[in-house]
């Protein structure tokens, strides 16, 4: 969640040898289990599969649950990529054939993608892990599944936002490596809401906004999302906690509407 493995079970946190963590270039272990840890990904797949089977059984005949989010704002905070032993070995290998063909490049990750190599490497790793998890769950109950993005923002370098997460620049990698996800969805807490809406709405990626600020200015963008971009979802975060009387809701300042 939010670039860290804060909600994994205690027994997994304690066994950091089997469920190994990502590392910074300095060797410092992070609070994020590495996406290169097959044992951890397999446990996640098994848990998600059981959850989907439970929903199928409990929601039979009702259809209350219409979509599932897999993970939350996935990625790696504090470094552009994982430097653990397994990650180092993978990073030194040649890029996957599908990416070589897609980008018309070749060689190792560093040779193929230069300064973007770390983020592209992590995008492929996280997307591949989510594909294993998602496809397992959908075998139990084929609900539409998506994952959400912590958006790029100042200071704009990978690791200041979760590196490898589904930001727009790596959508091609995510779409290739995680085809079971019907949408890559933005969590919008930035002022340039319209630009994000447009960036995440394109053929092959229906607009699905699972989180957006719950203020007066942002509320108006729901019309733009639904009418201009045919959004499937526009969900102000924590709206159920607002509970304000209409006269108590903050109104946009008049000057903000002036050209």
Model-derived regions, located:
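Short intrinsically disordered, low-complexity coil segments enriched in acidic
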Residues: 1-12
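Short secondary-structure boundary/capping segments
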Residues: 7-8, 82-87, 91, 162, ...
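Polysaccharide-binding and catalytic clefts of secreted carbohydrate-active enzymes
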Residues: 13-171
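Short catalytic/ligand-binding loop motif for oxyanion handling, primarily in non-cytosolic enzymes
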Residues: 2-4, 74-79, 154-157, 218, ...
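Catalytic-core region of carbohydrate-active enzymes that cleave or remodel glycosidic bonds
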Residues: 132-142, 169-259
């Amino acid at each position: 969640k939010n670039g860290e493995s804060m909600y994994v079970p205690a027994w997994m946190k304690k066994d950091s040898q089997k469920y190994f963590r990502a590392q910074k270039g300095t060797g410092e272990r992070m609070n994020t289990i590495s996406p290169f840890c097959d044992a951890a990904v397999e446990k996640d797949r098994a848990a998600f599969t059981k959850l989907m089977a439970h929903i199928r059984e409990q929601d039979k005949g009702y259809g209350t649950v219409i979509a599932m989010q897999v993970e939350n704002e996935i990625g790696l905070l504090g470094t552009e990529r994982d430097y653990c032993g397994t990650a180092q070995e993978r990073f030194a290998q040649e890029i996957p054939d599908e990416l070589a063909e897609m980008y018309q490049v070749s060689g190792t990750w560093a040779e193929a993608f230069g300064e973007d190599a770390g983020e592209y490497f992590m995008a492929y790793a996280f997307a591949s892990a989510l594909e294993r998890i998602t496809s397992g769950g959908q075998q139990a109950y084929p609900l539409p599944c998506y994952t959400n993005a912590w958006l790029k923002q100042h200071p704009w370098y990978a690791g200041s936002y979760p590196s490898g997460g589904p930001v727009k620049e790596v959508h091609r990698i995510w779409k290739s490596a995680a085809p079971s996800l019907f949408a890559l969805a933005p969590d919008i807490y930035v002022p340039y809401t319209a630009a994000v809406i447009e960036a995440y709405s394109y053929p092959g990626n229906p607009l699905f906004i699972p989180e957006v600020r719950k203020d007066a200015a942002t509320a108006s963008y729901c019309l733009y999302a639904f009418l201009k971009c045919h959004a499937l979802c526009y969900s102000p975060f924590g709206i159920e906690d607002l509970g304000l009387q209409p006269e108590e809701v903050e109104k946009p300042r008049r000057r903000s509407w002036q050209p």
